[in-house]
Amino acid sequence: MIPGEFLLADGEIELNADREGRPFQVTNTGDRPIQVGSHYHFHEVNNALDFDRDAALGLRLDIPAGTAVRFEPGQTRTVSLVPFAGERRVYGFQGRVMGPLPTAPDEPEQTS
């Protein structure tokens, strides 16, 4: 092995393989572009984005880590959202949650 060399497995890598994406239609009602990163809690995105915000509680974009989706002014597009995993605790963003999220429909209850 050469220092810094990557040894990658053959084949495709499936993102979020164990999570089912849910489609959401989103409209930018503002006058400026809005960009949302891969792990931003979608429930708490810019208020100029119009969508079923309550249904997006505990969800994030179903896109590769480190990437983003851009919504131009007046643009409507459909995005896929997946549940946060792990401890499902959300802090920061717009401060709407600041703690544990409700249990995802496809997740067992956390005990601790």
Swiss-Prot record:
Chief subcellular location: cytoplasm
Substrates-to-products reaction catalysed: urea + 2 H2O + H(+) = hydrogencarbonate + 2 NH4(+)
Superkingdom assignment: Bacteria
Residues making up the signal peptide according to the UniProt record: none
CDD domains listed in its UniProt record: Urease_beta
GO annotation (BP), single: urea catabolic process
Quaternary state and interactors: Heterotrimer of UreA (gamma), UreB (beta) and UreC (alpha) subunits. Three heterotrimers associate to form the active enzyme.
HAMAP family per record: Urease_beta
Protein name as annotated: Urease subunit beta
Taxonomic source organism: Thioalkalivibrio sulfidiphilus (strain HL-EbGR7)
Gene: ureB
